[in-house]
A protein has these predicted regions:
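Cleavable N-terminal export/targeting peptides
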Residues: 1-30
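Short glycine/proline- and aromatic-enriched beta-strand/turn motifs that initiate or cap beta-hairpins
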Residues: 20-71, 76
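A general structural-boundary detector
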Residues: 7, 14-18, 39, 68, ...
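Residues that define the transmembrane beta-barrel architecture of outer-membrane proteins
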Residues: 34-36, 46-48, 73-77, 96, ...
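Gram-negative (and chloroplast) outer-membrane scaffold detector with strong preference
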Residues: 54-140
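Predominantly the C-terminal beta-signal and adjacent terminal strand-loop region
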Residues: 74, 134-172
């Protein structure tokens, strides 16, 4: 139950009206103006696979990933709507913003030793840190996500999980 309250707190913080550098035009503070809005790359952790991020505005983005969930032993797909409310550092060569937001996760748990496969769907609350290079079309990230999910296998019901990962994306 405490975990559910923590996820709700993350979701409430994500909907907060506070935004990073609202008055600064793109290119002066935050994301470089010449960088593309679509990034494609790899994520390592839980899951390990491919990821993409598309900026909808300078401080909001949609990020997705698909890959193998080694700890959970299955194929995972997730999507998050993230906000970049705080910039920790803004240097000549990089920007270091924090991001957070709500999302969804779908996972097909593999058979394991019993050989039975089952499907679960859930809500994610993600928080992460982005190392956004200003002089190259790259970023690197670390993120932690809490998940409340429903397992559709009879008898398993609701559950909770954590995902942690890091990765690199190239922007077009």
């Amino acid at each position: 139950m405490r975990f559910a309250f923590a996820v709700l707190a993350v979701l409430a913080a994500a909907s907060s009206p506070v935004r990073a550098e609202d008055d600064a035009p793109v290119g002066e503070k935050g994301r470089p103006a010449e960088k593309g809005t679509l990034g494609v790359g790899i994520i390592v952790g839980e899951p390990t696979g491919i990821c993409a991020k598309i900026y909808l505005a300078k401080d909001r983005a949609l990020q997705i990933a698909a890959g193998s969930a080694f700890i959970s032993n299955g194929l995972q797909l997730h999507a998050d709507y993230v906000f970049h409310p705080w910039i920790l550092q803004d240097r000549d060569s990089f920007v270091l913003p924090v991001y957070l937001g709500p999302g969804v996760r779908f996972i097909d748990y593999g058979g394991g030793s019993q050989g039975d496969s089952h499907f679960a769907a859930g809500l994610r609350g993600v928080i992460g840190m982005l190392f956004d290079f200003k002089n190259a079309p790259l970023d690197a990230f670390l993120e932690l996500a809490g998940i409340v999910e429903y397992d559709f296998k009879s008898g398993n019901g609701a559950g909770a999980a954590l995902n942690f990962g890091g990765g690199v994306r190239y922007y077009f």
